Amino acid sequence: WVLALFTTIVVLFLFLPLVVVVAFSFNSGYSAFLWGGFSTAAYGQAAHDTTLVTALKISLEVAVATGLLSMFVGLVGGLAATGTRWTHRLLFVLFIIILATPEIVGASGDLLWFVTLGVSNGFVRLIIAHSIFGSALTALIVRGRALGLEPSVFEAANDLGARTPTMVRTIAVPLLMPALIAGGLLSFTFSLEDLVTSVFVSTAQTTPLPVYILASLHSQFHTDIFAIAVFIFISTTLLFLAALAAMGGGSRSRMRRGLRVLGATGAAEGG
């Protein structure tokens, strides 16, 4: 019973804040923190609040761009960090440093960098700043996956006459796709909820949702904020489950399919 009690406490500690947010999104009270009865009016108010919807749209656009950019940079960086030379190991250490650096330090550096270079576009600043963390995270995930690949696969591809770019395209990338999807999804999620970096690099014309919520705390915090939070929570959860379903299994089939493609390519070239 001790283990059951401890498990219950841990579950409540982790999920009770989410339950409170969902419950208070149906609050009919004027204040978000005082229960006034059950109502779905907050969802209608959130949908018609143009400022709130604009902030959500900016966050989603930046998060999507961050996820895609992090997947590309993370793939290249992750493969480069799998080598045994000192430069490859240095790249791996740099990725670790990026993740270990306090966010406020990195955000300050990003702001100084953008001001020095004269980058004033808020979208560009947000995407680049968020992608620095996302790319490092994706690169480490890709590296871990790449180190677990069987060398015999690439030896077989080499016996079929495949060149390195062909092996990367037909073997490595399909096998690394689960890691890429995971890295892109995590980068999307971290970008969507990032506050510290967004406060430093965003502009008045490109205010993402976390910055908007922070500003609302200093004025009037209404229940429509909770409604948007529930929407984001459900959306990201469904997206995460879909990614898990896409990543589940299929590694061996992707491997066999890649080798068949290489075999067909080699036969065609030989003919």
What residue ranges belong to the model's regions?
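C-terminal transmembrane helix and the adjacent membrane-cytosol boundary/short C-terminal tail
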Residues: 1-5, 81, 85, 143-154, ...
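Transmembrane alpha-helices
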Residues: 5-18, 131-132, 139-142, 150-151, ...
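A structural signal for multi-pass alpha-helical bundles of membrane permease subunits
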Residues: 15-29, 107-118, 185-190, 243-244
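Transmembrane alpha-helix signature in integral membrane proteins
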Residues: 26, 50-81
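Interhelical loop and adjacent transmembrane-helix boundary motif
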Residues: 30, 42-51, 191-249, 271
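Membrane-interfacial helix termini and adjacent extracytoplasmic/periplasmic loops
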Residues: 32, 40, 87, 104-134, ...
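Loop-to-helix entry region at the N-terminal start of transmembrane alpha-helices
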Residues: 54-61, 109-137, 178-179, 184, ...
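Short loop segments and helix-boundary regions at transmembrane helix junctions
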Residues: 77-95, 121
